[in-house]
Amino acid sequence: MTFNIIKLENWDRKEYFEHYFNQQTTYSITKEIDITLFKDMIKKKGYEIYPSLIYAIMEVVNKNKVFRTGINSENKLGYWDKLNPLYTVFNKQTEKFTNIWTESDNNFTSFYNNYKNDLFEYKDKEEMFPKKPIPENTIPISMIPWIDFSSFNLNIGNNSSFLLPIITIGKFYSENNKIYIPVALQLHHAVCDGYHASLFINEFQDIIKKVDDWI
């Protein structure tokens, strides 16, 4: 992984970053996403929905530098060339979850196979983070498949330097002959404004609609 340093004094977002970082301003937005065609196509091809959604999320994240901007372990501001998903997997027996990361790949089939291999290896481990070491360039993704929701918010402790997005997916539901899932996006205002939240949602919806192009 490559971490590219941002020189704050020369950054065109310096004023906004300092203001919102000092305030520790984060926000969340939840939007229902139409997955009617997507769900049908995934089912026909014999794939699982969760890793397919993770792939679509990572395509948006890795396409846009703003979603890869963060602070590394050396307390340096910058952006990674690529992020990998760190996603939750629920264990029905223990009623707890594990967090597993998988290498991102632009090719869906390659990513899906890597996901399945990691899932087989680590899903039954009774640890919160069974696959170690966890690289710095990961982004949290989770799914709450038991309920659909109209809003969802996560709060990280004060003085946190975590700037990357956090994505949470809910249960899909039917309405007016269409199928939707709620997607909650948690962002840090120091690096992402409302425009960027809209960018994520719109591009995610677009890649979901164009599932024929990549599956």
UniProtKB/Swiss-Prot annotation:
Q: Tell me which species this is from.
A: Staphylococcus intermedius
Whichever gene encodes this chain, its name is cat
| Enzyme Commission number, as recorded | 2.3.1.28
Q: Which Gene3D superfamilies match?
A: Chloramphenicol acetyltransferase-like domain (3.30.559.10)
Q: Which family does the record assign?
A: Belongs to the chloramphenicol acetyltransferase family.
Keywords, sorted A to Z: Acyltransferase, Antibiotic resistance, Plasmid, Transferase
Give the protein's recorded name: Chloramphenicol acetyltransferase
GO BP annotations of the record are: response to antibiotic
The yes or no answer to whether the keyword Acyltransferase is present is yes
Q: How does it assemble?
A: Homotrimer.
SMART domains under this entry?
CAT
Name the catalysed reactions: chloramphenicol + acetyl-CoA = chloramphenicol 3-acetate + CoA
Its biological function? This enzyme is an effector of chloramphenicol resistance in bacteria.
Active-site residues are 189
